[in-house]
Amino acid sequence: MNTEGESSKESLANREERILDFWKTHDIFQKSLKNREGKTLYSFYDGPPFATGLPHYGHLLAGTIKDVVGRFATMDGYYVPRRFGWDCHGVPVEYEVEKSLDLTTPGAIEDFGVAKFNEECRKIVFRYVDEWERYVHRLGRWVDFSVTWKTMDASFMESVWWVFRSLYDQGLVYEGVKVVPFSTKLGTPLSNFEAGQNYKEVDDPSVVIKFALHGDPASLLVWTTTPWTLVSNMAAAVGPEITYVRVADKVSGEQWILGQGCLSRWFSDPDSYEILESFLGTALVGKSYEPPFSFFEHKRAEGAYKILSGSFVEESEGTGVVHMAPAFGEADFFVCKEHHVPIVCPVDNHGCFTEEIPEYQGQYIKSCDKGIIKSLKNLGKVFYHGTVMHRYPFCWRTDTPLIYKTVNSWFVSVEKIKDKMLRANQKIHWVPEHIKEGRFGKWLDGARDWAISRNRYWGTPIPIWKSKEGEILVIGSVKELEELTGEKISDLHCHFIDQLKVEKEGKTFQRVPYVFDCWFDSGAMPYAQNHYPFENQKETEAGFPADFIAEGLDQTRGWFYTLTVISSALFDQTAFKNAIVNGIVLAEDGNKMSKRLNNYPSPMGIMNTYGADALRLYLLDSVVVKAEDLRFSDKGVESILKQILLPLTNVLSFFKTYTDLYGFDADNYDKEEITYSEIDRWILSNLYTVVGKVRESMSSYNLNTAVNPFVTFIDDLTNWYIRRCRRRFWESEDTPDRRAAFATLYEVLTVFCRVIAPFIPFISEDIYQQIKTEHSAESVHLCDFPHIDLAKVFPDLEQRMSDAREIVGLGHSLRKEHKLKVRQPLANFYIVGPKDRLDELTSFEQLIAEELNVKNIVFYKETPSFVKTTVKPNFRSLGRKVGEKIKDVQRALSNLSQDQIQQLLKQQYLLLNLGFEEITLGIDDVVISWETDPGYVARSSSLFTVVLDCQLTEDLIVEAISRELVNKINTMRRNHKLHVSDRILLQIHSSEDVEKAFLHYEDYICEETLTVQFEFKDSVEGEEWDINGHPTVIALTVASKAN
């Protein structure tokens, strides 16, 4: 047995640093991999972060989940390689460079030089790599940083080209013009799933404009929240099946047309207008109108400014008439295209009006809203002007408003493979389960073609070479490009290959000026990380689909989605079999964590203060692993440390103290000779039940339900088993009972440290190192995860102990409620319950008596005559539920029999007959109370009622004083930091009653406190105490120190 235990005074955070050094010095992670080489592969895809910023709690949460699953699978016998990868391309990197070089104006990057700009991007990609490694290392997460993959590596980029070429060969790639989300700050389109990542509640203009009809005295009332799009209006749409009304102002006679269902929204006074007629929307289709502005009046000849039929038009908001600017709305675009209405887009890539709108040329569109509204007011075309609060998409990276805009782009035909994606989703085990048909399934069901081209620079170039005649060549490999150009290729970034032209059949082909959406890189990761299919084919195919993946809820529209798109298209297969989806970690106030607002504690500071295990367990034992949001609290982490981890270290310290004192050789005790007590068998049964529960939860990837059993077990171990068995460990003689206690606790610790190893790897290692033998594995993380030992599982025993603890809990509640210290002995404790359960409790009679400090336990099958349980209405709950029937309920409750009340307690509900109807009452709808004879108090649970005899005799009062003395003297021993075997001398000054109690219980007090001599004096210099109302001074000195 290794007996070199560390000081219990050492902080857990410091112990973790020591354990990190141990893992590093002894190369434990690599040994854990080597131990499993040749075993069944467990494939795991790690979502790549950007190293342009520091890790936040979301990264640490996902990292913890991944680490737990990887460690568990390794301990369960699988080979689990854990490569780390880096996202290197795209907006996050470019944006950082733009800010640092002040390249904020249109054309600034071109002026600076694309080649120089890209190289600056390359330089900062790994700005925080060292910090990332430090955070991951400190968290206790095991990943291999020596074999990382990077999306900017030529090998990775070549595989991305292969993926694209494969999609193109299947007819899944096309060039087109569509309305897509567009970031004016970045000057590039975004994908629909990127646009869905950052919605905000914003105030926007709410304007109703009058479109004067030609040949009709009325005007259409048209609502919009984007006044800037009115300059590009090309049509108006009405719902063909919607009923419209023509109304006239009773004063001015002015006429307007709008949806009948929208009238009350815009006309608060029904007496102010008159309805002249009503008709279906089809009656309006084809009519022409006067547009709000005349910038594109010449487009009327091409079919502009007519009313179209639109099935998408609703009356739930607005006026029932939709203004259509087809360049800036997806539905507008398709309807106008179907009806051959011209499309105009007088907005450049930076969100500024072009020369087509001379009044506002060069101005940012949103800043023109006020001017446009003012102009329309001057023209008498504004019916209403206000504001509206609504959700609006913002750029996920720059946090600026997005617009929807027509762009020329390259698309992947996602809609063609939607059925494949839906089939793939059915093969995925999602945690939580509702993600499958909920957030992810619905997103797949509404999936749109993916705009994959970006007007940016630092990314994987789209490998399309195009001739002036419109012919295209799609390149799928470096070798192919080298053969077509005759040039040696070392780097695939655009500033290395854009000058390369392909001459073929008398035509010159030039690469199109786009890079891939960086999410395309990420979606290709399963193949590109291994340079598939150019290398590592066997390795890649063996690990596809991945056994496991884990990321945040936002990735259901991000990485989870792009992985599924590409794997479905290429292989008609899912990219991963199991997925854990976590929620978002918010600041404690419920807002998003913000560096600017400084509304969250430093992750590294939290780990260095409370320990990484405390942070890991806090996250794992919360709703955030069930895809719900968590308000982060450092007090929550501190609570985990104090209530769970420190008590567990105290168990280890307790075990080490007595094994070192009395000797316990784990290699040389004979298990067959051990006679286990009932409580030993209970804790071992409980232990192996926990093993089974954790295994079962981990097999279904339910980390939250995996954590709960072992957290509960720590409480069972510390607050019940150890507390109940202390005296057995204190025994100075080497008795069979002491050996059984040592053997039991040793087995518990050796098994339990392996159970918790994947979740809280530091404390598990600390326990293991202090109890391992010379024949043990070098580290707990080189051990197998334990299996349930059915021979040691006794469900009936666990149930009996659970009943006993429930009864003890009821008794303690009564003592607390009636201010009766546990150290005050009481005469009787009555237990009422089902006969079969009471019969099973007889063996625990002494245990219950000791726990509650009562002299006598009495079992009753029926409530004794001196106790009556009563039920009254909970007026706050029932008042809302039954209303005027509350008096009938009150009357019926007063007539309940004791049997009916017991049924209510057991079932937690009751069908209550009011005479004229039956209603269902829940336990929260009533207030339970107990009427007892004087001197008794009672309380019930669903199965048991307990009654405490509170009557105090002189003997009980004297005994209470003796117990209070023991408590205070042992408190002094702890304060003096005495060893558990140090003997002491006492001098005491107190009342005659205290002296009498001490002398009467002399043997008990001296044995419990290791007092070898005591003396009562008239005056003592010592510590002052209140002994049940008797002022007392106690002086303590050490008689003999332990060796």
Curated annotation (Swiss-Prot):
Main EC class the enzyme belongs to: ligase
Q: Where does ATP bind?
A: K595
Kindly list any coiled-coil regions of this protein: none
Q: Does the keyword Magnesium apply?
A: no
Motif 'KMSKS' region extends across: 592-596
User: Could you mention a single GO BP entry for this protein?
Assistant: isoleucyl-tRNA aminoacylation
Q: Which family does it belong to?
A: Belongs to the class-I aminoacyl-tRNA synthetase family. IleS type 2 subfamily.
Q: What name is this protein filed under?
A: Isoleucine--tRNA ligase
Organism equals Chlamydia caviae (strain ATCC VR-813 / DSM 19441 / 03DC25 / GPIC) (Chlamydophila caviae)
Its lineage reads: Bacteria, Pseudomonadati, Chlamydiota, Chlamydiia, Chlamydiales
